[in-house]
């Protein structure tokens, strides 16, 4: 097969030489990330059920999850949730095969509950949350497209995916900061810190200002002095991480900058997530498939979480574009690599309408040949992504 792969060389300075950069990551306990996580966990659970029953994944998309914030009354040493968080799990799934019924609603409820229990330590899914699955049937034409792709799945949409490599120092710092704050080790050392974490970085030349918003768990904090000590300790740990990752940058760390210590108006929550009061969440409003929000870099607005991992190019092409960019970067002398993939509905996913690869820097003709080869090989094996996504080896937010 001869694929439409175009490799272009861009003679310009790499992005790291720009004066300004902004990067954001919403942590796993942020309402938007919780919506993503629930959507993806439901999709994976359905995939496993379909495989167990029928030996293959059936048509579904569960990429519509809405979190409606509850109401809470946090206070030092305690607090309560007085109106639960409402979570609506919608989408489409195959509920019948012949006369056999698949309990789609039950699977969705169990998957969402399990995900919340694993992700937000202080969230009581029996008291603090109401989960309502409302998953319907997919349209006949898209189910038909799904079923027709026996050897290679057929694209369910005309859509595009974008990716780039490598990550900048600022991007790595933002990603790793959230991962560290939500790591088991930090939660053991500082159990007062909740899972709802948001990290924003502004780089101006060589200076990075890192702003962290971290929900604190009220029942674990005795008073304002205790709260302040936790914030200061968290700031120190983030600063230590920044010294490792961004040693050649001047990094300034801020934590919970909206706090007013004199009025004791601080970021307290009962559960560790702002979804308990005042902050709603939706699939696709947060991190892109590389775990970041990067307004200075190419991004797709596609909500990848919850989409089926078989033929939904909105998911597969964004994952593949980043993988393709990384591997091309590793195998060539390019300073940066940018990849764009375009599908056409009804056509095999391994044969995109267009593959556009940009190599930035002083590259050779051999580098261009390598880029084409890597792109071609990854497209040839695109169906391998499905199992890796189902097994949770690939994250999409």
UniProtKB/Swiss-Prot annotation:
In this entry, which stretches build a coiled coil? none
Pathway membership, UniProt: Amino-acid biosynthesis; S-adenosyl-L-methionine biosynthesis; S-adenosyl-L-methionine from L-methionine: step 1/1
Which Gene Ontology molecular-function terms are recorded? ATP binding; magnesium ion binding; methionine adenosyltransferase activity
Against Pfam families, the record matches this protein to:
AdoMet_Synthase
- Which positions does UniProt annotate for ATP binding? 136-141
The enzyme's first-digit EC class, named in words, is: transferase
Q: Does the keyword Cell membrane apply?
A: no
Assigned protein family: Belongs to the AdoMet synthase 2 family.
Role according to the record: Catalyzes the formation of S-adenosylmethionine from methionine and ATP.
Protein name according to UniProt: S-adenosylmethionine synthase
Q: Which organism is it from?
A: Methanopyrus kandleri (strain AV19 / DSM 6324 / JCM 9639 / NBRC 100938)
Species lineage: Archaea, Methanobacteriati, Methanobacteriota, Methanomada group, Methanopyri
